[in-house]
Amino acid sequence: VELNAGAAAPRYCGRVIEGVDAAAPTPLWMAERLRRSGIRPISLLVDVTQYVMLELGQPMHAYDLGTLQGSIAVRRSRAGETLKLLDGRDAALDDSFLVVTDADRAVGLAGLMGGFDTRVTDATTAVFLEAAHFAPAAIMGRGRKLGLHTDAGHRFERGVDPELPRIAMEYATRLIVEVAGGAPGPVVEATLAQHLPRPQPIVLRRARLARVLGLQVSDAEVERILRALGLTVERLAALDGAAAIPSGVGVADGAGDADATASRMAGDTDTTQAVQGWRVTAPTRRFDIAIEEDLIEEIARIHGYDRIPTTLPAGAARLVAPTETRV
């Protein structure tokens, strides 16, 4: 497997399963769960990839191994390149798409839909399973260019845990072998570690938490909630006050008042005293946690919105002395 798209496709897992009975019926329990999720059962191999996507959130694809030539690669499409998709339409591509290729041609539109010529059928006896991580920016808007709206595309646009591909591969393999038999080969994985998304630590200030929620949540409760959500929490006895002020403070705002932004932060941080708080790191699956306010929202949600007191916002009145011109 070769990755030639940089940060757009930093991880790809593949596995060959030979000797499968692709005509085996999808188990009733799986077909019923797919139907209840709004997905029409098609065939065992396709249904397994769809089911794993629903359970784990990792889109997958199955290729008929007999239709592939040579090694697999992921690259940017070329302007004027065409690909016949699973739904039978011919997609005319520009250079903004990601494609999965074999030695001869594009065989799939990465993160969106597989190719028609390499699809699995009831006659398939060997399958190549794909589970990959594609960056949201590389998939976003590409489906709409072609009028495609797929479950895989919607998930990749919003972000998928980069640690999921191998987990999903093992789960899908187990389900296929249990029902259709076959001999799975080793997982072939290609990774560009420098391009994988890495969660950044977020500083949560105790003073900011109390100010936003309007109540004091104990240190033990804050740490219990965050750890229960799978976050890594490190207690900070003190923070440098300057480091506690978010970037952007003191720059000109819409009114052209450079001091206004800094003054609005006065209630959130004290530049003369240490600010206590926590350094929190979210797991790779939590794309929705990126800033301090996201952490505060999680604490409020678990602690209980009903426990937040109802109070009117307090504002400080400021009297402006009339100038001589206005008089």
Each PLM stretch: what is its role?
Residues 1-242, 272-326:
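RNA/tRNA-interacting regions in translation and RNA-turnover enzymes
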Residues 50, 255-258:
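Generic hydrophobic, helix-prone segments enriched in Leu/Val/Ile
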Residues 238-245, 249-251, 256, 263, ...:
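Intrinsic, low-complexity polybasic segments
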